[in-house]
Swiss-Prot record:
Residues 1-24 are annotated as: Disordered. This is Chlorinase cctP2. One of its GO terms (biological process) is mycotoxin biosynthetic process. The gene is cctP2. A motif (HXXHC 2) lies at residues 177-181. It holds the Pfam family UstYa. Keywords: Chloride, Transferase, Virulence. Pathway: Mycotoxin biosynthesis. Residues 1-14 have a biased composition (Basic and acidic residues). The 2 HXXHC motifs are conserved in ustYa family proteins and might form active sites. Its EC number is 2.5.1.-.
Length: 314
């Protein structure tokens, strides 16, 4: 009897174990089925987002490739690559269609006076510029020179030197000044490291490298407008072939050409009418550095200038 009972117990145990295994198997399958459905739902939801993200990345890459980010110059905030200008192998400043005299006149007409600017100390600090020589009509401003205008001035002097030599004349520009200008342009060229590739078109016997090739440039007119807004009232007077301005009795005469409506007009008028009034920014003994001949020339210049003012007002 005991053996039979034991056999029944074993069979019951086996049956229960089999049931449990089957139940676990069914439940495990149910869990796996639920997990698969959840994973499938997540994939279905994520797929559109992944596709949209992929498309946006492609569009962004294409935008960056096709259109460069906008960049601006340090001080005048000139936009890089703003205008398209074709390169010309020869212009009216150098071609054979104009006479030497006509081309010389064009070069001599270049006036870089506007490149002298007066910038307030606050603005120069914001721009990260070192403090400069004090502007004579406002102690809170310094005098700066646009480097673009400085370089342009050098090209004018180089023309004057080579033109005089070509004409068989002794150049009036000093060779030392020419060396300075050549070195200035050399430094500029190496600083900018222009990587534009000039193409070599087939022009027969004429090797006109880069002729007509389009270039992306800053707008010079916008630089001109920026410096004019900060005018130092400077003017080169009676400029010579040597690149020097003469005919002034005092250095301050060069800073008396303010644009109409300038707030410095009263100071300048007093400076002219009263015979060089010390504005407070000049050394007190500045006038004593002049020779008697220079003082006489200055007095004559003052008289003639004031006479002209009266004539204009009459």
């Amino acid at each position: 009897m005991e053996g039979k009972t034991s056999r029944y117990q074993d069979e019951a145990h086996d049956s229960a174990g089999s049931f449990n295994e089957e139940t676990e198997g069914l439940m495990s399958g149910l869990h796996r089925s639920t997990k698969k459905r959840k994973l499938s739902s997540i994939v279905k939801l994520a797929t559109p987002f992944l596709i949209v993200s992929f498309i946006l990345n492609i569009v962004q890459l294409a935008y960056i490739t096709v259109r460069r980010p906008e960049c601006y110059s340090l001080y005048a905030k000139l936009k890089e690559h703003e205008i398209t200008v074709p390169f010309r192998y020869a212009t009216e400043y150098s071609d054979d269609e104009h006479t030497h005299e006509e081309k010389d006149a064009l070069w001599n007409a270049i006036d870089i006076s506007e490149g002298f600017v007066a910038i307030s100390n606050d603005e120069s600090d914001r721009l990260g510029l070192p403090r400069s020589k004090t502007f004579p009509w406002d102690a809170n401003k310094g005098i700066y020179v646009s480097h673009g205008h400085h370089a342009l001035h050098c090209t004018v002097l180089l023309h004057a030197y080579t033109y005089d030599a070509h004409q068989g004349k002794k150049p009036l520009v000093s060779y030392h000044h020419i060396e300075h200008c050549l070195d200035l342009l050399r430094q500029d060229i190496m600083c900018y490291a222009n990587d534009v590739m000039d193409y070599t078109p087939d022009h027969g016997d004429n090797f006109l490298t880069g002729e007509g090739q389009q270039r992306k440039c800053r707008d010079w007119n916008k630089l001109s407008a920026w410096v004019k807004e900060r005018s130092a009232c400077y003017k080169t007077i009676n400029i010579t072939r040597a690149g020097e301005d003469h005919g002034v009795a005092h250095q301050l005469d060069r800073y008396t050409y303010c644009p109409p409506g300038s707030p410095y007009e009263p100071l300048i008028k007093a400076f002219k009418d009263l015979g060089r009034v010390n504005t407070g920014n000049l050394a007190a003994d500045g006038f004593h550095e002049l020779t008697p001949e220079e003082l006489a020339a200055e007095a004559q210049a003052v008289a003639e200038h004031n006479k002209q003012i009266l004539a204009d007002e009459g």
